[in-house]
Amino acid sequence: MERKYNVAVVGAGHAGCEASLACARMGLKTLIITLNADSMARMPCNPAVGGIAKGQMVREIDAMGGEIGRITDRAVLQFKMLNSSRGPAVWSPRAQCDKELYSVLMSKSVQNQQNLEILQSEATSLTVKNGKVCGVKILTGETIEADAVVITTGTFLKGTIHLGKMHFNGGRFNEVSALYLSKSLIEDCGLKLGRFKTTTTPRINSRSIDYSKMTEQFGDEKPVPFSYSTKVEEWRKNLKQLSCWLTYTNPITHKIVSDNLGLSSIYIGEVNSKSPRYCPSIEEKIERYPEKTSHHVFVEPEGYNTNEVYLNGLYTGLPFNLQQQMINSIVGLENAKVIRYGYAIEYDYSSPLQIKKTLETKTVKNLFLGGQINGTTGYEEAAAQGFVAGVNAGLKVLGKTPFILERNESYIGILVDDITTKGMDEPYRMFTSRAEYRLSIRNDNADLRLMDAGHSIGLISDKAYKKFELYRKAFTDICENNAENLPDDEDLSPWSIEKAKEEVYIHKKYEGYIEIQNKMINKMKKSKDRKIPEDFDYNKLKSLSAETKQRLFEVRPQTIGQASRICAIKPSDIAILTVYLEKQKKERKQKKHNKIK
């Protein structure tokens, strides 16, 4: 049987699901190829969606017609707005999820989507003719013809699992890895691949935990859903939130770990690749911060119908017997029983300097990459790239203008710009500090910023868009003190007048600050040619992180512009450096003036 599609998506994780749904909803005949049709959109690490800057990206995907926000709202166990004690610009929604329910709901969404088919198989190579991809070869030897291909392989690309000194092939524990595709990406597509690693935590039985010794962490009293389409009051009524719990490691825990570093797969030479700096294993934390006597361990439920509990903060590559000892040394976990052991996983990734801002490869036309294959880490970063790659694959097939989000429009735009411009030498994670426009690209205004784009692509229906236009007009009228003939909530639903008023309050609060922000950004752009002294001591800049100082000392940039292009250097770092150099210049000028006097 001949199989021919407009778009073929390889991989059915968070990136692959968003990519395939976007293409199918754009009216394109789409195929998603997965190693296991029963494990789509799994949460193999933390069973949560959102967080600092990540929650903003989920809202952005939702505002443009993506799926992750809607599914999260239906699978949520607990909701918290992070940074709520600070200004709204950095408020970040986060939801603890029922991991099985999330996977089931996303899988159902993919299965029920018109124009979208699923095939369980392994993609072994790509067919490339005259510099353009035209198909995917699968394990059976069959070739799937496709006008465009999106690769979203996650940790499965030559994935290797390490547990102490044990190591074996796998994309996740008990799941096979994709062994053949890497060779084709190198030989047929001319891509350079590297290796990254990450670790996950042990899961324990909730019945073996003494919660009375821990601090209970409640969800928000008035949770706010991720998706604009979720009706807030109805959702809150039906939401049964579960608590998370907080405990800590201690000197005994640290001694068990430090005495056995040589047995961890992270240190015995089995895993030589870089891991996420901001999601370190417990081994790395204890080695990196020997002065600390404790580290947080968040004890998080994994679902309504399971006793499995996730130990957030105990990512590890230690042998299983030492994992048990380590866990039992922690207060409240003295009698804890392990259900699944933590492990390290290594996988292939492609340097994102080899892709355009559309996420199309520079070496092969109509081939797009999304998610961890681009060197990022996190479900949200993956979903965002999957969405962008899927949309652009669809637009390329349709012969339409590419879809590119800019840094001043969205966190997704910042993510794509960062990875395609600066590249990386360790897994990339999104933070609010990476966003110079964070005062204007908040989580609360994602719909106002991006729903026009979603509608123009064809992922927001005309019906939903008409409601949105009514809401936007209400927002504008309230802003301009013209609130006499506002529509009823019934006409605005799922938006409301209350939501519009809240948005106006935040908008007015930040109006002046946004002007200052934009002036500062323009000043930074103008100062890109400013020289940095060769012997400049970055330790003088107390506001810079240790990572930033390390990068600047390593590269020794000659100008502000060069410094801004260094991997992992954030706009906030450049602002600090620019202000300091400006201050130094003024001081020198003043000294010179005083001498003349």
From Swiss-Prot:
Its main location: cytoplasm. GO terms for molecular function: flavin adenine dinucleotide binding. It holds the Pfam family GIDA. It comes from Endomicrobium trichonymphae. Keywords: Cytoplasm, FAD, Flavoprotein, NAD, tRNA processing. The keyword Isomerase does not apply. NAD(+) binds at residues 275-289. It is found in: Cytoplasm. Homodimer. Heterotetramer of two MnmE and two MnmG subunits. NAD-binding protein involved in the addition of a carboxymethylaminomethyl (cmnm) group at the wobble position (U34) of certain tRNAs, forming tRNA-cmnm(5)s(2)U34. This is tRNA uridine 5-carboxymethylaminomethyl modification enzyme MnmG. FAD binds at residues 11-16. One of its GO terms (cellular component) is cytosol.
